[in-house]
Amino acid sequence: AMGADKLGLSDEELREIVNSWRKASPHIKQLWYDVDAAALEAVRECRAVTLHHGVVFSYRKGILFLRLPSGRRLAYVRPKIEIEPEFDREGLTYEGSEQTSGKWTRLRTYGGKLVENIVQAIARDCLAAAMTRLEAEGYQIVMHIHDEVVIECPADACDLGNVCRIMGRSIDWAPGLILTADGYITD
C-alpha cells in the first residue's frame, strides 16, 4: 500500500516495518481506535461523541458529521454499522464517490482512515487561515498546493520573512499548535 510494493520488499518485511512503526507510535494507534469507537457510537446511539481538541462526531438525519476544531464539518452520508468479515468486528460504511471510478457506492472506513481525514482537513483549515491573513495583508495568492502558497508580487515588495511570520501566527481555534513556515523567492 501507498507505494510500498515498489520498494522490492516482501510482504513479511512490510508487515515487520508496519508493526515496528505501530509499536513505536502507541498514541497514534490508540487514536485510531478512539476515533473508530467514537464514530460507531455516534451512529449507534444517534448522539454527539466528543474526542480530543474539539473533534466531535454527531449523527443527524442520516448523516454522520465530524466537526473539526475549526468548526468546519465533514459529512459521511447514510452511515451504517456492518460486520467486517475479514476482521469479524463491527465497522462503519457510508455512501460516497469511489476514488478511482467516481461511481457513487457504499464505502468502508475505519479509525485510521478517519484520522487521516481529520489530519488532512485540519491541515487544510490551517492553510486557509494563513491564506486569509496573507490576503488581508495585501499579498496576492495565485495558487496553493497542499501546504504551500504561491504569491506573486513585485520584487521590491516581497518580504519573505513577513510572509513566513504571517503564515506561522497562531490560530484561535488551535491554541498551542506551533506553526512555522519557510519559503523562497524566484523570478
Question: Residue spans of the language-model regions?
Answer:
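Conserved catalytic core of nucleotide polymerization and phosphodiester-bond processing enzymes
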Residues: A1-D187
